[in-house]
Amino acid sequence: MSPSLTWHDVIGQEKEQPYFKDTLAYVAAERRAGKTIYPPQKDIFNAFRLTELDQVKVVILGQDPYHGPNQAHGLSFSVLPGVPAPPSLGNIYKELVTDIPGFQRPNHGFLQSWAEQGVLLLNTVLTVEAGKAHSHANLGWETFTDKVIAALNEHREGVIFMLWGSHAQKKGRIINTERHYILKAPHPSPLSAHRGFLGCKHFSQANQLLQQQNQQPIDWQPKLPAVE
C-alpha cells in the first residue's frame, strides 16, 4: 500500500453518494425535531480521525453506539471519562485481566489510547436515538461501513480483525484471510460472553501477530488523557 493513502482518498467519495447524504439528512432532521441522537454530531466520525488508514493495525467491530447519556463518542465499546464501563466493556476488561500479564482493570471506559495506537474502534452503525438500541439500523450507515472494511481489505495488509458475535462476523465475510487475520468469538455482552468470549485471548493473539510482522504491539491498558 502507498503509505500516503488516507481515509479521505479511499472513502471520501462516499460523501457524494445519495445514500450517504440521505443518512446524514435523516440524522440532522431527527436532531432538529428535538430527538436526542448519540453520539454528538462532532463525534460521529471520531474513529477515522483518531486512527488514520495507514495506521490501522487492529479493527474491533461493534454494532451501534451506546444509547445512554454521555456514553458514546464515536469509538466502539468506549465511553467518555467519568461514565462507568458498560457491561460489554466490563467483560472485555475481565478478559484482558486474564489474557494480558499485568493488566489492571481501569476505573473508566475511555479507549482513546487504543485508537491512538492503531486500533480502529468501528461501529457498523454510527448513530442511535437515545434509549432506542438499533434505532438507526438500515438507514445507510451499514453501506458506508462496508466500504470502510472493503477499503482496509484492499489497501492494507496484515490487519487483525476482531469479530465478536454473529453481526460482526457476517460483516467480516468480505475480508480476504490470505491478506489479513480474523479472530472470532461470541459477543462480550453478558448474554453471550460466557459462551467463549471469556477465554478467547484475542488481545495477546493480536500482539503476537503484530510482533510476527515486526510491528509494535498494542498497550491494552487504557489511559486517560493527561490533565493539562
Swiss-Prot record:
Its main location: cytoplasm. Its EC number is 3.2.2.27. It comes from the Bacteria. GO terms for biological process: base-excision repair, AP site formation via deaminated base removal. PROSITE patterns: U_DNA_GLYCOSYLASE. InterPro entries: UDG_fam1, Ura-DNA_Glyclase_AS, Uracil-DNA_glycosylase-like, Uracil-DNA_glycosylase-like_sf. GO terms for molecular function: uracil DNA N-glycosylase activity. It is found in: Cytoplasm. The active site is at D64. It holds the Pfam family UDG. It catalyses: Hydrolyzes single-stranded DNA or mismatched double-stranded DNA and polynucleotides, releasing free uracil. Gene3D superfamilies: Uracil-DNA glycosylase-like domain. SUPFAM superfamilies: Uracil-DNA glycosylase-like. Excises uracil residues from the DNA which can arise as a result of misincorporation of dUMP residues by DNA polymerase or due to deamination of cytosine. PANTHER family: URACIL-DNA GLYCOSYLASE. Belongs to the uracil-DNA glycosylase (UDG) superfamily. UNG family. This is Uracil-DNA glycosylase. It comes from Yersinia pestis. The gene is ung.
